[in-house]
Curated annotation (Swiss-Prot):
Xref: SUPFAM superfamilies: Ribosomal protein S5 domain 2-like
Enzyme Commission identifier(s): 3.1.26.5
Pfam families attached to this UniProt entry: Ribonuclease_P
Gene Ontology terms: biological process: tRNA 5'-leader removal
Quaternary state and interactors: Consists of a catalytic RNA component (M1 or rnpB) and a protein subunit.
Protein name in UniProt: Ribonuclease P protein component
Top-level class of the enzyme under EC nomenclature: hydrolase
Family: Belongs to the RnpA family.
Keywords of this entry: Endonuclease, Hydrolase, Nuclease, RNA-binding, tRNA processing
Catalytic activity: Endonucleolytic cleavage of RNA, removing 5'-extranucleotides from tRNA precursor
Function per UniProt: RNaseP catalyzes the removal of the 5'-leader sequence from pre-tRNA to produce the mature 5'-terminus. It can also cleave other RNA substrates such as 4.5S RNA. The protein component plays an auxiliary but essential role in vivo by binding to the 5'-leader sequence and broadening the substrate specificity of the ribozyme.
NCBIfam families the record matches: rnpA (TIGR00188)
GO cellular component term of the entry, any: ribonuclease P complex
Amino acid sequence: MHRSTLPKRARVLKRKQFLYISRTGSHCQGSQVIFQVAPSKYPGCCKLGITVSKKFGKAHKRNYFKRLVREAFRQKRHSLPACQIVVMPKNKQQPRFRDLLQDFSQQIPEAVESKCAKNKLTTGVEYNPKNEKCETAPL
């Protein structure tokens, strides 16, 4: 049986990683979510982290939000540039799946490009995430 899961290597798991993304990444807002996006330290693959506070709602509502975000990321991750993403809800309203798909397609590449442009201005080093697509085969 084929499992459509998000592998561990495609997740942000440690507090240290979440802090790195929030400190060094750029912030952008989708229709119902907030993205924190940082260029990946390791070329080749996107990573996803999800943060949902208890203010969002009860456990079943938070878990449903996480399932929606994971599935949207799983479907779009092969077309995203190499980056690390943390997703948070913007308000207490549950996002629609098609809005999440659209946000992943539009907001993430723009955020990575703007962050890379800022890095080039401050460090003089150009980083081109478009050349580093996630090459892992779907599981």
